[in-house]
Amino acid sequence: MVQAEKYVVMGGAGMLGRAIVRQLVERGHTVRVLDLVQPVEAFCETIIGDIRDPRAVEEACRGMDVVIQTAAAVWNVRTPRALYEQVNVDGNRLVIDTCLRLHVPRLVYTSSMDVVVDGRMPIVDGDESLPYPARMPPDAYSRSKIIAEKMMLAADSPALCTCVLRPVGMYGPHDKYHLGNVIGMARKGVSLRLGNGTARFSHAFSENVAHAHVLAAQKLAPGAVVCGQAYFICDHYPAENLFDFMEPFLRALDLPIPRRSIPYRLAYALAAFAEIVAPFSNFNRFAVIQTCVDHTFVDGKARRDLGYSPIVSREEAFLRSVQWLRSPQSM
């Protein structure tokens, strides 16, 4: 039986954070949430605050056994570039410093597969041996996540055991970005594919990624193999083209299936133009490359060190996601 502990989940009102909170509460742990908004579910104590705010972070971390840090400025058209640095770099630096000052012994950080994507070369069955890009990627989000991940790994010590999880393309209930972007465009009548449909992409359901975070938190201890390590987290089914992955969701919602496609080279040229006329848009060359070039990963290291295996099947993940997409919350 797992001993009950005290956890704070930063970003606990988000897609991943909600799933982590739910799993921790089900295991009998005491859970606190730090987020900009109040979670709909009244699972636990909530502190409304920002990870850039020293007082809010201190209040959240005080007396905790574990910090699970999922909060981030995510890749979105409305996110100012400066915010990535402020939240993903400065905010995480504050979290590390606060954990050390308050003697919080364990810290799990949610990174991203994007930290190894260089924007030029395809990745097929990538693992943790992949280096960071020799040149920083062109988008502010990926740059900030690389810096934050390096900070988190460097912070590992007997006083603060840290590890980093790198989810691949994550989806599930309350997904406003991965599923949300494609479904949102389809609801507005935009039905286009990018590329020739051969590029493959790895995915992970939010509950499975949450399970990996809980496992990582339990494994952290001075001298443990997981300390100072990064792990890719995937679902265990073959990678597929992004638009092929999205098609069953569109069908379930009676939305149009994209049949027209923009060739890769044309999409790349249009994205380069968009970077000039709409620099805050998510339609940029990096986004086109990620969609039109293979980005697949494996998680053998997480299986070995964390004992990770998905707890929700693809079929069940689809049903849960569609149920949420049909709800008023997703509109």
Residue ranges of each PLM-predicted region?
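N-terminal Rossmann NAD(P)H-binding glycine-rich loop of SDR-like oxidoreductase domains
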Residues: 7-27
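Mid/C-terminal beta-alpha module of Rossmann-like enzyme folds, strongest
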Residues: 219-282, 318-322, 331
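Conserved C-terminal active-site "lid" loop/helix of NAD(P)H-dependent oxidoreductases
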Residues: 206, 230, 270-309
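Active-site Tyr-X1-5-Lys
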Residues: 136-163
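Conserved Rossmann-fold NAD(P)-dependent oxidoreductase catalytic core, especially the SDR/UDP-sugar
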Residues: 94-141
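Amphipathic terminal alpha-helices
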Residues: 6, 299-304, 309-331
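NAD(P)H-binding glycine-rich loop region in Rossmannoid oxidoreductase-like domains
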Residues: 40, 49-90, 98, 118
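Substrate-positioning beta->alpha
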Residues: 143, 147-148, 175-181, 195-219, ...
